[in-house]
Every structure is written in C-alpha cells, then in structure tokens.
C-alpha cells in the first residue's frame, strides 16, 4: 500500500502531472461531455488537468481538422489556422454556426412563401465554406425527433446543393482564358478532383467519403506491412510504385477484376467494405453496368499514386507517368479490354500503335503527340457524360420492396440520385454535344441561359451565386413549390402509410379525393417520388408502423418528405405535418374553398 501511494506522491517522477501532453490529448479524445461532468464531481484535479488550455485547445484543433477533412470541397477556401490562434477561432466559429442553425430553424417555422424565399436566400449569404461543413454535419446527423425535424434536414440538403453549385459551374463556364487554361491543367493533373466536383451536385455522396478514406488507408496499411517505413517505398522508382499500388488496390476495388469474377456476385459481397468503381469516384449510381471505364480507372490509379509522390498526367487513353529510368523519361499506363491496367515504355507503345500505320516515322512525329496530349476539361467532361449518363439509374425490378432493398441497391449511399439531378447532368451533356458539333469553344448565348434557367428552376438561389443578382428572372417553378402543387384537402387523410398491391412499395398519403366515382390518393414513396394513384391499387399498411418508420427514417430526410412532414407521431402511428402544411390546411379550411378543379 505504501509503495503504491509513493508512486503518485507529488514530486515523484511517476506522478500523473508529469505525463506528456500527447498522453493527455489521447485521454481527452475518449472523454465525453457526461464523463467530464462526472469527473468534475469525483476528481476535480484530474478534471482541471484534462480541460486545461494546453490540452483542450489542441483537442479542439484536432477534432475540427478531422471534421474539415471529411468535406473535400472546403480544403482550398481558407488558409490553415495556426494552433496558437485556433482556440479563439473555434469559439467564433461556434457562434456563427449557432446563428446559421437559428436561421435554419426559423425556416422550418416560416409559413409565408415569399418570406420563406427571402430567409432561404439570406442563409446563402454566409460564406460558402462556412455553410458547407456545417450543413454537411447537420445532414449526416440525420433525423432526431424534436431536435432535427425532417423539414430542417430537407432544407439543409437543398442549401448544400446551392452552395456546391458554386464549384460545379466554373467547370462549364470559365470567365476568362487564364481560368480555362488552369482548368485544363487541373483536368490532366488531377482528374479525380474533376469527378469529385461534378458529383458535388449530389449531396448523398458525403456518405462515401468515409468508405473512400477506408480504402486509401487500407492500401497504406498493406504497404506498411511490406515496408517498415513509407520512406522505403518512396525510394522505389515511380513505375515500380505504380505497379505495386495497382496490385494492392486489386484487393479493395472491383474495377480491376476479370469479367467472370463479377458473375454471381452475392449481396454479402456487395455490402462489404470493398469499394466499387463508381463509389470510389463518388458517382456510384450514374451507371448500372458492372465494368469499369478506362478514363475513370486511370483516374483512380492517378488518385492513389498521387498520394505516394508519383508525378503523372492523364491523356485520352493513357496515364503518363514521369519515369527517369525509361526511354524518353516516361512510362505509360493503360487499360486493356478486360479492364486490367498494365504498364509499358515508349518502345512498346510505338510497336502497338504503329502497326495500324504504314509510315512509322510519320506516326511518331504527328500522331503520337496527339495521343499523349493532356486531356482537356471539355474532353474529360464529355467522356464523363457520354459513358456514365447513357444508362439510367439502376432499375428497381429486382427489389420489389424499396424499404427493405436499399442496402442491396446502394450499399454505401443512403438514397438514389434524384431525378432532377440526373436530368441536370443529361441536360448539360446535350449542351456539350451541341457545343462540339457547332464548333463552339465555350458555352454562350441561349444554351447558357437555358442551362441556368433549368438549374434555377430546381434550386432557386443559384443564379445569385453564379452570375450575380438579377442576371435572369427567377422562374416560379422551383423545388419549394412542390408543396403547393400537391392538392391538400383533409388533415385526417394525410400522413398514413399504404402498400402498393402490385410492387409492394411502401407509400405515404398526401391527399385523398374522389372524381367520377373513383378514389385517388396522392402518395410519396421513400425516395421522394410524388404520384397520384388509384386507391384500389393500394392497401393500408398492415405491419408494425414503428418498425417501418425505423427502416427508412435515415433515408427520407434527404428527400422531399420534409416539404410536408416534420417527423413521425408514434401515438397516432402517422407522419406529423410541418408548420407550412398545417398553415396551408388551416387557411383552406377557413376559406372553405374547393382545393381542386378536376
């Protein structure tokens, strides 16, 4: 007993006061708010040690940096804050985050359409990097009864779309020649960022960032098992690094497997930690095909090798790697018909391509430079639209009940790409197709106006971000008006669950009315699709409503359910109407006017 007490005597070399700050920092990361409260009551000296400025400031700094790294779009918007200044910045940031949240909460209580629009645009006036990370976190937390209602998450989702349009539009509408040149350079040097920015239009891609980081960390762990230090691996010549990284990546990515390997793939594998081609590039559902595309696979290889100091650029069909030991100082990576990447030198490249040309010398002087020219932003975008948008999103035939098939359909994401997002990309593809056919070098004139008008119809507020105030007249047909287009009649008919007799889909009623002796029910499914259906094709849900809600409560906040509902009422076993819809029904009841004229 005496020896044990002596170990912790003040002044002893073993006292806890002499533990290095790194140890206290690790301890503080494991301590939650309730733990700190209990610790304050039990051992105030230990509590003061953990919460001291020296430890707590560094903990705040580390936590914030980790949170920032989750959002790939915020990295270049402000300089990193020195540790010495971080604590005060952390406190300031918490203040304006609370302000944003108050404004967002006020948005859920607004019942006047014009005032709603004004408040929505007011939130967009915050700097985009402030909004992006905060909204990202709100959406990721999901629906929390009484704290994070459905309508709040839905509005946050639309706001985040608005913010991220700022990153998408410069890809299509560069303001000057210098900016266009920089974009082209970025396209060849870092094709991954192009795909990430394109995918930023779909906010559900946030769920894939953790899985993507898991893959990159797994590759690093495998390297550390083979090499004691990463520095040993970095000493290898670039082409060797590329080869070994491709080999290791095969264990994590499905884009390098042989075609017969994907046949008979089970759901168990689909829900594992393997990351699919579209998942890695955060474009998982724009194509339903099981094989990879050359440009995307090469961009994946480029993204992985870039982390290990491999200098490369992306050409049309090749990834060109700087390799001093090879002739001409370059090595070439391409993908064969079986989507297997392989590496070769210039001599092999000439022997393969020159067989198709009678004059080998003419090929090397004229054709080869064109083949190895860095890919331009226009060609990269065209490749993306041509390959990934020719297919519709994955069909639902194999999943009769969407509520129980979401994990099989989208093992990493939580929701299908919305129809308006698919239309957005398809619309831009048509513009690019017409642009190249007409020989135009940039989007101009009516095509640009059509594009901006289309996007603005689905996401009002974008025009102010992109090209300034009052550049185009905002149309009345925007996403917020969906709640006004749905015919509402009786509160007692809204919010109950139904099952489609034919497809077994789970639906929620938005209205019910009778026309010419037939009863119609306006429904919304768990993906936010609103349709009018015959009542004879539906049946009231017979199962456990509470379990049903739990099965898709993580999905619907990212859809348009929040335009009508704020949560689930367990006592009444139905959805709760949000303030906007309640106000609308109240006004209609007071006016006693017909709600539809069919």
From Swiss-Prot:
InterPro entries: F-box-like_dom_sf, F-box_dom. Gene3D superfamilies: 1.20.1280.50. It is found in: Cytoplasm; Mitochondrion. Pfam families: F-box-like (PF12937). CDD domains: F-box_ScMDM30-like. Its main location: cytoplasm. GO terms for biological process: mitochondrial fusion; mitochondrion organization; protein ubiquitination; proteolysis involved in protein catabolic process; regulation of mRNA export from nucleus; SCF-dependent proteasomal ubiquitin-dependent protein catabolic process; ubiquitin-dependent protein catabolic process. Keywords: Cytoplasm, Mitochondrion, Ubl conjugation pathway. Residues 13-59 form the F-box domain. It comes from the Eukaryota. GO terms for cellular component: mitochondrion; nucleus; SCF ubiquitin ligase complex. SUPFAM superfamilies: F-box domain. Substrate recognition component of a SCF (SKP1-CUL1-F-box protein) E3 ubiquitin-protein ligase complex which mediates the ubiquitination and subsequent proteasomal degradation of target proteins. Probably recognizes and binds to phosphorylated target proteins. Recognizes FZO1 and regulates the amount of FZO1. Regulatory factor for the mitochondrial fusion machinery. Required for mitochondrial DNA maintenance. Interacts with SKP1. Component of the probable SCF(MDM30) complex containing CDC53, SKP1, RBX1 and MDM30. Interacts with SKP1 and FZO1. This is Mitochondrial distribution and morphology protein 30. The lineage of its organism: Eukaryota, Fungi, Dikarya, Ascomycota, Saccharomycotina.
């Amino acid at each position: 007993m005496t020896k044990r007490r002596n170990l912790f005597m003040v002044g002893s070399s073993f006292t806890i006061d002499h533990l290095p700050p790194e140890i206290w920092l690790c301890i503080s990361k494991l301590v939650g708010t309730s733990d700190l409260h209990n610790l304050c009551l039990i051992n105030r000296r230990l509590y003061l040690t953990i919460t001291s400025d020296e430890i707590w400031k560094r903990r705040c700094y580390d936590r914030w940096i980790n949170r920032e790294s989750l959002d790939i779009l915020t990295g270049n918007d402000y300089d990193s804050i020195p540790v010495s200044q971080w604590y005060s910045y952390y406190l300031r940031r918490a203040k304006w985050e609370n302000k944003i949240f108050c404004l967002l909460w006020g948005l859920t209580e607004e019942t006047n359409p014009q005032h709603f629009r004004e408040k929505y645009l007011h939130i967009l006036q915050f700097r985009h990097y402030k909004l992006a990370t905060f909204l990202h976190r709100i959406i990721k937390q999901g629906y929390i009864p009484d704290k994070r209602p459905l309508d709040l998450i839905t509005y946050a989702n639309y706001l985040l779309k608005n913010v991220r349009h700022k990153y998408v539009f410069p890809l299509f509408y560069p303001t000057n020649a210098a900016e266009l040149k920089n974009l082209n350079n970025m396209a060849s040097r870092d094709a991954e960022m192009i795909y990430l920015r394109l995918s930023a239009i779909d906010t559900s891609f946030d769920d894939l960032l953790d899985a993507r980081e898991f893959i990159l960390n797994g590759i690093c762990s495998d390297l550390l098992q083979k090499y004691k230090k990463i520095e040993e691996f970095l000493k290898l010549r670039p082409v060797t690094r590329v080869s070994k990284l491709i080999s290791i990546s095969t264990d994590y990515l499905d884009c390098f497997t042989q075609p017969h390997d994907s046949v008979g793939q089970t759901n168990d594998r689909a829900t594992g930690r393997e990351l699919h081609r579209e998942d890695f590039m955060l474009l998982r559902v724009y194509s339903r095909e099981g094989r990879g595309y050359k440009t995307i696979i090469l961009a994946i290889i480029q993204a992985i090798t870039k982390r290990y100091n491999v200098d490369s650029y992306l050409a049309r069909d090749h990834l060109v790697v700087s390799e001093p030991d090879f002739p001409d100082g370059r090595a070439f990576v391409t993908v064969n018909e079986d989507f297997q990447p392989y590496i070769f030198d210039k001599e092999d490249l000439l022997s393969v391509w020159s067989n198709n040309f009678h004059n080998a010398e003419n090929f090397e002087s004229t054709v080869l430079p064109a083949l190895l020219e860095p890919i331009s932003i226009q060609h990269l975008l065209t490749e993306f639209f041509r390959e990934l948008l020719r297919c519709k999103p994955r069909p639902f035939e194999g999943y009769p009940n969407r509520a129980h098939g979401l994990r099989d359909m989208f093992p990493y994401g939580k929701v299908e790409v919305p129809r308006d997002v698919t239309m957005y990309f398809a619309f831009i593809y048509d513009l690019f197709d017409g642009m190249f056919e007409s020989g135009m070098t940039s989007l101009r004139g009516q095509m640009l106006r059509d594009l901006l008008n289309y996007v603005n119809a689905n996401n009002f507020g974008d025009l102010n971000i992109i090209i300034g105030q009052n550049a185009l007249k905002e149309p009345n047909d925007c996403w917020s008006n969906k709640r006004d287009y749905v015919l509402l009649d009786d509160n007692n008919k809204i919010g109950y669950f139904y099952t489609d007799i034919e497809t077994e889909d789970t639906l929620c009623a938005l209205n019910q009315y009778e026309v010419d002796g037939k009863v119609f029910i306006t429904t919304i499914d768990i993906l936010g699709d609103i349709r009018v259906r015959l009542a004879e094709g539906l049946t009231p849900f017979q199962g456990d409503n509470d379990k049903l809600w739990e099965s898709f409560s993580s999905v619907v906040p990212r859809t348009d359910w929040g335009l009508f509902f704020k949560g689930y009422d367990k006592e009444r076993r139905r959805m709760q109407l949000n303030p906007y819809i309640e106000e609308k029904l109240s006004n209609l009841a007071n006016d006693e006017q017909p709600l539809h004229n069919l």
